[in-house]
A protein has these predicted regions:
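Sec-dependent N-terminal signal peptides
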Residues: 1-4
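C-terminal motif of bacterial Sec signal peptides marking the signal peptidase cleavage site
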Residues: 7-10
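Cationic-aromatic interfacial patches
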Residues: 12-163
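Well-ordered beta-sheet/strand-loop patches within structured domains
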Residues: 12-60, 66, 144-145, 161-171, ...
Length: 502
């Protein structure tokens, strides 16, 4: 609370000694003649305490009014010039953003404003004080909620997704406090409307009641709602050049100054909803809980710092125990045919054919696949720091790129055109030529090469967007993350419907 007080300390206003006379002049209601700042402050404190549980940011709101002697800025400066009416109008159109207008209390604000404009509506001084306090609190709370929703999204993706590692800015006290110093409501509200062309396109589709081919109108609407929320999150690339993978689209683009300079198919991790049994139309309360499969590719952002040409595959223990050891138990020559070496306590075992994999503990051995045509990572992998130990890589399993559903990997991203990606990462020149040559060698040695300048990489999850022709694209919710997001949105909107009832 002390920290919040510092936010408002330098902006503290003087108490309005002419409060009663000013309100009487503007309302023609004699009740206001006896209103004083001191009398208002006493009631205001009580109303704030009563409504604390009904407000999203009670500490921030309380800190402002405490620092400003409970000065009713919205009532005094914004009711009688029509500003608050404008605000309520914007709130009432929140459905155009896929949001519930009830969150922003437009009806309550209009009802309170109407009482101030009707000289007989407010009957006594206590009612006047309470209505001033309620209108101040309601307007402040709704402006903060509306501003946060449009600029940052309603939900924090980090709180709803277990595998979300993308830097995402969330609202802070300094930003939220801006609403107390608005001079022109319409100008402020216009300034916070999302202006991204993708957002405007999906917003128009929602307003027009668009129905996607093969999808019901209800499901289409929910597609639009969840992807509008994603577009409001402040997690978008800020660099001029970056690589971006969209998991549901199974594609990678390299963007440079807003244009795609390379586009390719990719394969991503196997997902929980590849059979499409979960949908946005048919879900229940438990669907809001994110239960990712072990193989799902995470959402993240990082920097590609190096490549390994002709890599050695250090096979993860989960894959080794569930797949490699099972196959080796069936066929003693499986490991040698796949160029896989076996290690125990860091020491290479020379005759793995003699080992009893069927009865060995799952974590007894380590497995490494040597470079070559059969290596699961192909001829090159692109490395970037991340908590999930995933990377981009080549693959010998090219047939998967001919399929429409390409959520087939163990979690890493397989590239349809690794050579083209290497060329974009390094540019034409001796380094790329060296890499390209090494990828064709018959008996290669693994080589690590640093990426000069590094390349930002974003792995995202977008199921609905507008393509370059203006056509809205829809993709199946392969990981069920739309269902999770929609479930949380519904719960949040329902809880805030109760908060709105001041």
């Amino acid at each position: 609370m002390a920290a919040l007080a510092l936010v408002f300390q330098s902006c503290s206003k003087k108490s309005r000694s002419d409060l009663g006379a000013t309100l009487f002049k503007k309302t023609n209601n004699k009740v206001f003649k006896d209103a004083t700042p001191e009398g208002l402050a006493e009631v205001f404190k009580k109303v704030l305490a009563e409504e604390k549980s009904h407000v999203n940011n009670p500490n921030l709101i309380n800190a402002y009014y405490e620092a400003n002697d409970y000065d009713p800025a919205f009532v005094m400066d914004h009711i009688f010039n029509g500003d608050v009416d404008v605000t309520a109008t914007y709130f009432s159109k929140a459905g155009e953003h896929g949001l519930d207008p009830k969150m922003f209390n437009a009806d309550q604000i209009n009802a309170l404003v109407a009482k101030f404009k009707d000289k007989k509506a407010i009957k006594n001084l206590d009612e006047a004080y309470r209505d001033i306090a309620l209108l101040e609190i309601t307007t402040a709370n709704s402006l903060i909620n509306y501003s946060n929703a449009l600029q940052y999204g309603i939900l924090s993706p980090r709180k709803i997704y277990q595998r979300y590692y993308t830097a995402t800015k969330r609202p802070d006290s300094a930003g939220m406090s801006r609403i107390f110093y608005i001079k022109d409501m319409r100008h402020f509200l216009d300034s916070i409307q999302p202006k991204d062309p993708q957002y405007l396109s999906l917003q128009k589709a929602l307003k027009d009641g668009t129905t996607a081919p093969g999808i019901s109108k209800e499901e289409t609407t929910r597609y639009l709602v969840v992807n509008l929320e994603r577009l409001r999150w402040k997690n978008k690339p800020t660099q001029a050049k970056y690589a971006i993978v969209n998991i549901p689209d199974y594609r990678l683009d390299v963007m440079d100054n807003g244009k795609s300079i390379l586009d390719m198919k990719v394969c991503v991790g196997e997902g929980r909803n590849t059979d499409k049994t979960e949908s946005l139309v048919d879900y229940d309360e438990s669907d809001k809980i994110d239960r990712p499969f072990d193989r799902e590719t995470p959402q993240l952002n990082s920097m590609i710092h190096s490549v390994q040409v002709n890599p050695v595959w250090n096979i993860p223990q989960s894959i080794a125990s569930k797949e490699i050891m099972v196959e080796a138990a069936k066929d003693p020559y499986y490991l040698s045919n796949k160029n896989i070496d076996v290690y125990e306590n860091g020491k290479k075992i020379e005759d793995p054919e003699t080992l009893d994999f069927a009865n060995a503990p799952k974590d007894k051995y380590e497995f490494k696949q040597r470079p070559g045509d059969d290596n699961a990572l192909g001829k090159i992998k692109f490395l970037f720091n991340n908590k999930s130990s995933v990377y981009l890589h080549d693959t010998p399993a090219k047939a998967a790129f001919d399929k429409s559903m390409r959520a087939v990997s163990h979690g890493c991203v397989r590239l349809g055109n690794p050579d083209g990606f290497a060329k974009v990462v390094f540019g034409e020149g001796s380094t790329y030529d060296k890499i390209s040559q090494a990828m064709t060698e018959d008996n290669p040695d693994p080589t690590t090469i640093g990426v000069p300048g590094k390349l930002p990489i974003y792995i995202t999850y977008i199921t609905c967007w507008t393509d370059s022709t203006g056509t809205i694209q829809f993709r199946p919710d392969v990981y069920g993350l739309d269902v999770v997001l929609y479930g949380h949105l519904q719960r949040f909107l329902a809880s805030n419907d109760q908060i709105a009832k001041l």
